[in-house]
């Protein structure tokens, strides 16, 4: 984990390595820092918020916006996250939206661009991880980059380029049935190669244990052969620390949020940022509380069942929905009297069989758009009805709800656990949000998080 003896040792080794070769880059003194050292482009809001929360927990001030145009208006944070809903949209649209974010961050002078995507590398052959990375290579001027989706603490690991969920290849896991991005090929070298003209190679696990010098030599040899993209084997937390030490000076890096936890120690060791931690806090937020769930992940279904033991839950059947407006009106009529007695849950989440039936009727994208449209419009109506605390399950759902609510900038709290980000809007009548990855979080997360929002110490 970030701050561990292993990561500190690697950071020190990294510093000694460069000083001994007179490669240290002159840095600005702390008091005159005006350029961010780390610019993150996240392909969904849950992951973007998680990344920001990890940096904040490490004492790194981090701005968080959903509109690239707002990057210029931020103060002088050393890190900025631009989170957009691009994970499952067509590649050309994802590239266009990412270009706006990248240009905004580079215009601020970002020292490194980090493209954040999911630990399960959610992407089909028509996916956009490859095209977006191609764009970022061009804009950043990077000659090569690596791909590190792994999250060892959650048993999302990569070995010989193959992605595992626990002991299962991802193609043998429930992710093979994902309604939007079914993962049927576990070989990430193959998956990525089908999305890009850049040659894809592998940083095999034995190299990670050999040290930085052998890693750099291997990369130099492979790039001489034309390789530009490297899938990084990652099994242990120490592998993430090694990869962070290797890539902290790269113009472009890509991966899951977990590797980001290891950068702050390196930045501090190099004098890029002050060693003193900031002490962020989020205010308590009152008002009614609601769970809005759109994810069909097994973990979200378990969390809904747990929440329902003590709180009412409405499940919206997409096959019976007579359009967005009708479904929203019916859900609002159901929720209003119940909110007087405590939090409620409203979900479009369904079993895989039910999802398949909805997709047969509406198409894959049509079913997703219907569900997101219902929950997004419902969030607006619920806010008008006095709801100020929202727990949202699902990355695509989170993006839709934040967009419908017109939220463009958030004050993010420190990291609260894998896949979980908590934030408040910066306004006189704030809204508290927990944007949760569909696949992650403890079973009792919904009720405990809504309760914690009532107390500032609960979301600090």
Q: At which residue positions do the language-model features occur?
A:
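N-terminal basic/disordered segments at the start of proteins
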Residues: 36-75, 96-97
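Short acidic, glycine/serine/threonine-rich loops at helix termini
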Residues: 50-53, 125-129, 156-164, 214-215, ...
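C-terminal structural cap/anchor segments
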Residues: 335, 339-393
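Conserved, well-ordered active-site substructure
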Residues: 387-388, 396-445
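Short, low-complexity intrinsically disordered segments enriched in A/P/G/S/L with frequent Arg
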Residues: 3-5, 10, 24-28
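Glycine-rich, highly charged phosphate/nucleotide-binding loops
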Residues: 68-69, 90-104
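Conserved, well-structured core segments that form the ligand-binding/active-site neighborhood
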Residues: 167-331
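Cap/lid and interdomain-hinge subdomains that line or gate substrate/regulatory clefts
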Residues: 34-37, 78, 94, 102-240, ...
């Amino acid at each position: 984990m970030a701050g561990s003896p292993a990561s500190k040792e690697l950071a020190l080794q990294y510093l000694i390595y460069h000083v001994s070769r007179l490669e240290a880059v002159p840095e600005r003194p702390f008091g005159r820092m005006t350029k961010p050292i780390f610019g993150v482009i996240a392909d969904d809001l849950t992951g973007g918020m998680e990344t920001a929360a990890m940096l904040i927990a490490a004492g790194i001030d981090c701005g968080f916006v959903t509109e690239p145009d707002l990057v210029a208006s931020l103060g002088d944070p050393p890190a900025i996250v631009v989170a957009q809903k691009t994970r499952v949209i067509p590649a050309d649209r994802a590239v266009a939206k990412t270009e706006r974010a990248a240009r905004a961050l580079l215009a601020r002078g970002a020292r490194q661009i980090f493209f954040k995507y999911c630990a399960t590398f959610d992407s089909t052959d028509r996916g956009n991880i490859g095209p977006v990375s191609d764009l970022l290579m061009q804009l950043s001027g990077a000659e090569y980059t690596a791909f590190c989706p792994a999250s060892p603490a959650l048993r999302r690991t990569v070995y010989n380029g193959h992605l595992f969920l626990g002991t299962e290849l991802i193609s043998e896991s429930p992710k093979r049935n994902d309604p939007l991005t079914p993962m049927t090929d576990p070989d990430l070298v193959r998956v990525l190669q089908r999305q890009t003209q850049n040659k894809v190679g592998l940083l095999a696990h034995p190299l990670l244990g050999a040290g930085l010098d052998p890693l750099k030599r291997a990369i130099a040899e492979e790039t001489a052969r034309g390789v530009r993209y490297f899938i990084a084997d990652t099994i242990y937390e120490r592998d993430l620390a090694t990869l962070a030490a290797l890539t902290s000076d790269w113009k472009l890096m890509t991966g899951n949020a977990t590797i980001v936890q290891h950068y702050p120690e390196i930045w501090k060791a190099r004098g890029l940022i002050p060693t003193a931690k900031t002490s962020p806090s989020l205010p308590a937020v009152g008002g009614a509380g609601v769970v809005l769930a759109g994810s069909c992940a097994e973990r979200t279904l378990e969390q809904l069942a747990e929440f329902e033991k003590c709180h009412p839950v409405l499940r919206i059947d997409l096959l019976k929905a007579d359009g967005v407006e009708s479904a929203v009106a019916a859900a609002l009529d159901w929720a209003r009297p119940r909110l007087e007695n405590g939090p409620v849950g409203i979900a479009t989440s369904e079993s895989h069989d039910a999802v398949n039936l909805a997709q047969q009727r509406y198409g894959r994208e049509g079913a997703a758009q219907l569900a997101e449209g219902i929950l997004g419009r419902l969030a607006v109506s619920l806010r008008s009805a006095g709801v100020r605390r929202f727990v949202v399950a699902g990355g695509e759902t989170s993006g839709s709800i934040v967009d419908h609510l017109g939220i463009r900038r958030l004050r993010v709290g420190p990291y609260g656990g894998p896949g979980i980000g908590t934030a408040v809007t910066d306004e006189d009548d704030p809204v508290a949000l927990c944007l949760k990855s569909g696949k992650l979080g403890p079973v009792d997360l919904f009720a405990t998080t809504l309760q914690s929002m009532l107390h500032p110490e609960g979301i600090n």
